[in-house]
């Protein structure tokens, strides 16, 4: 079924072609094909275990951290296949940043949470680093809340602030793509609303791919939505079409709560 899903848009940020993914001998993704549009929000929805987070983690090869996992096919980024072993995965992850389900600030100051990643890829003066930290925190709509306590621990922040700190950390290295794996599932409604507002602002500068279990969230913030089930991409289209005029019965059943 997945091989029938055509890519959308022109000059995509990522092109996924004939992608399979394996956990040992188990096939977790089956022939996934789609394009991720530049400077748009693409949401991945589907029941638990459908492969949406697995797919997201292939985009910057996070699976390399786990023995026995492998991907086959192509993920094209500027015309080069990210799955080739010759790719420098550290550079891939600099260009394709990731924010996880639970806030994961480093056990260091707010300032160092931002500066640490930047130093891995760039040499700059102290004043330039100060500017980069401020820039990243402003991008994550956090500067006004933390500018007077940059030397305090990132762990001292609230859950919602910690997640925005993680977003600031991701954008500080100036990626092209930001991956968000259920970034609000551990947050309260007010913090969730702030993250959603932030995502809407960030897409003017970054391509964003988000996994969410919250269909209303996907409908609110995304331009494109992909519905996945049992490792297959069942349907992919503009978000309004997916939610108002789905082309597949499985999609309709899922978004109307009749799935199963």
Swiss-Prot record:
Residues 14-255 form the ABC transporter domain. GO terms for molecular function: ATP binding; ATP hydrolysis activity; ATPase-coupled phosphate ion transmembrane transporter activity. Keywords: ATP-binding, Cell inner membrane, Cell membrane, Membrane, Nucleotide-binding, Phosphate transport, Translocase, Transport. One of its GO terms (cellular component) is plasma membrane. GO terms for biological process: phosphate ion transmembrane transport. PROSITE patterns: ABC_TRANSPORTER_1, ABC_TRANSPORTER_2, PSTB. The keyword Transport applies. It is found in: Cell inner membrane. InterPro entries: AAA+_ATPase, ABC_transporter-like_ATP-bd, ABC_transporter-like_CS, P-loop_NTPase, PstB-like. Gene3D superfamilies: P-loop containing nucleotide triphosphate hydrolases. Its EC number is 7.3.2.1. It catalyses: phosphate(out) + ATP + H2O = ADP + 2 phosphate(in) + H(+). ATP binds at residues 46-53. It is an enzyme of class 7 (translocase). The complex is composed of two ATP-binding proteins (PstB), two transmembrane proteins (PstC and PstA) and a solute-binding protein (PstS). Belongs to the ABC transporter superfamily. Phosphate importer (TC 3.A.1.7) family. PANTHER family: ABC TRANSPORTER I FAMILY MEMBER 17, PHOSPHATE IMPORT ATP-BINDING PROTEIN PSTB. Part of the ABC transporter complex PstSACB involved in phosphate import. Responsible for energy coupling to the transport system. This is Phosphate import ATP-binding protein PstB. It comes from Thiobacillus denitrificans (strain ATCC 25259 / T1). The gene is pstB.
